[in-house]
Structure formats: structure tokens, C-alpha cells
Amino acid sequence: MFKDRPDRSDEVVLVGRSNVGKSTLMRAVTGHQVPTGQKPGVTRQPNHFDWASEDFMLTDLPGFGYMQGVEDGHEEAIKTEVVRYVESHADNIMVGVLVLDGKAAVDIIDRHSGGDEIPHVVELYYLLEELGVQPVVAVNKMDKVDDRDERLNDIADRLGLYPPWEQWQDVIAPITAKKDRIAALEDAVNSHFDAAKRDDLKQFFS
């Protein structure tokens, strides 16, 4: 279903549910306009942004969950393709940025928890870890959240990260992409570039 991936050795991917602001975040990181919209699921194919002279790219993968105006079964197919993409290119993916809606994430996770069910976003977080891809959780739309620390602690807890969230600042990054407030994400991603001794990649998140 997904088209061919550009030939780049290193990559950072943006993953998450529909309508959490992945495309807006991609615009904030790259400084270039990318397709965004109010309807859930605007991005249906991976949106790759590469720098012509560099062996690196940033990829916005389609959101999973509710998509307006698509046939039944397509949503699950998108999720399967996202997982397949990450699995297939895990060796190239330096960081997997899991984008959450800070205001809605806890409710969505709790709604899909219980019994044998694992919420998609939690499943995706664990998948990144299992594949050896460093996860960074970009908690977006924080300008709409009143109880900031409590909300971030709850998100950390749902992901199996013992609160307080502040001790996980290399993993949890509160941001507001629409207002270009992404410094916490840049710091988190760059800390992993540091650990990998890839200072050459820090120019893309600064």
C-alpha cells in the first residue's frame, strides 16, 4: 500500500493516531509546508522530507484510528502498513517520535485498556523499543492542557515509565507544534543523536 521509500541511510519517523498533529510537527521541524487538515487521516501515504545533500530524512507516517471518508477496514490496513514500515526499516530509523494529543491521550489509552486489549499507542511504543528504535513521546497540544505535570505523569505511567515524568525528559517531550514550541522534542532527539555519536544529525532538530 505504501509507495517506495527514498534511499536514505538515516531516518526519524513520526507515528501516532490520526489528528494528533504529526504533519504540523513535521512543518515545525523542517520549516516547510506539508499537507495538514482538520479531517482525521489526511495523510494516507508516508510523507518524506529529505535534504538533498544529506543522507537523512524525516518521515511522517499516516495516522491510525478514525479516518473520515474511508472504507471499513482501511483504518486497520493503515495501522498494519505503519507497523510493517517501522519493522522493515528499523535499522535505518534513529528515533521513532510517537506523537500524542496531550489533552486526549490518557482518556483514549484508558478507553482501550483492559482484558486482552492493548491500546494502539502503547503497543506502538513497545514495538519501537522491541525493534531497537529509540522512542520519544511528543506530547502535543500542551497549550490546551491545564494540569500539565499531572497529565504528563499519567502519560508516563500508562507507558510503563515510573513518574515523575521529569526524569524521562529524553523520552517524554511536551510540545505545542502549532505554535512552534518544540524545544523539548529537539532536546530529546538530540540527546539520542549524542548517544549514537551522530552530532552531524543535530542540525535537523535545532
Swiss-Prot record:
Q: Does the keyword Nucleotide-binding apply?
A: yes
Q: Which ranges carry the EngB-type G domain?
A: 8-195
GO BP: cell division
Q: Which cofactors are reported in the record for this sequence?
A: Mg(2+)
Q: Where does GTP bind?
A: 16-23, 41-45, 60-63, 140-143, 175-177
Q: Where does Mg(2+) bind?
A: 23, 43
Has UniProt tagged this entry with the keyword Nucleotide-binding? yes
Please name the SUPFAM superfamilies in this protein's record.
P-loop containing nucleoside triphosphate hydrolases
The terms under GO molecular function for this entry are:
GTP binding; metal ion binding
Q: Which family does it belong to?
A: Belongs to the TRAFAC class TrmE-Era-EngA-EngB-Septin-like GTPase superfamily. EngB GTPase family.
Read off the PANTHER family from this record: ENGB-TYPE G DOMAIN-CONTAINING PROTEIN (PTHR11649:SF13), MSS1/TRME-RELATED GTP-BINDING PROTEIN (PTHR11649)
**Record's NCBIfam families?**
PRK04213.1 (NF003255)
Q: What role does this protein play? A: Necessary for normal cell division and for the maintenance of normal septation.
Protein name, UniProt field? Probable GTP-binding protein EngB
Organism field = Halobacterium salinarum (strain ATCC 700922 / JCM 11081 / NRC-1)
